A protein has these predicted regions:
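Short basic helix-loop element that most often maps to the first helix and adjoining turn
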Residues: 3-22
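Helix-turn-helix DNA-binding elements, focusing on the entry/boundary residues of the two helices
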Residues: 5, 16, 27, 42-45
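Conserved hydrophobic/aromatic packing and binding residues within compact polymer-binding modules
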Residues: 5, 19-20, 30-33, 59
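Generic anion/oxyanion-binding catalytic loop in active/binding sites
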Residues: 8-9, 20, 34-37, 48
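DNA major-groove recognition helix of helix-turn-helix/homeodomain DNA-binding modules
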Residues: 24, 43-58
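Recognition helix of helix-turn-helix/homeodomain-like DNA-binding domains
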Residues: 24-39
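Conserved short acidic donor-positioning loop in nucleotide-sugar-dependent glycosyltransferases
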Residues: 62
Length: 63
């Protein structure tokens, strides 16, 4: 999931801060998701999926 989230963010040309603002989390939390330090809860995964225009399954199961 971490690599997918980072790749999606870079592809969308967004900063960790921009993603964090959208999902209601800090820049550090987004960084933690991107480097395997933590995983988003289901509600946050849904927001990330919406932000990156992908399915929640893609995020949760790292497809």
């Amino acid at each position: 999931m971490a690599i997918l989230l980072k790749a999606a963010r870079i592809n969308a040309e967004k900063t960790q801060e921009e993603v964090g603002n959208y999902i209601g989390k800090t820049k550090q939390t987004v960084a933690n998701y991107e480097c395997y330090k933590s995983k988003p809860d289901v509600a946050t995964a849904q927001k990330l999926a919406e932000f990156y225009n992908m399915s929640v399954d893609d995020i949760i199961w790292d497809k």
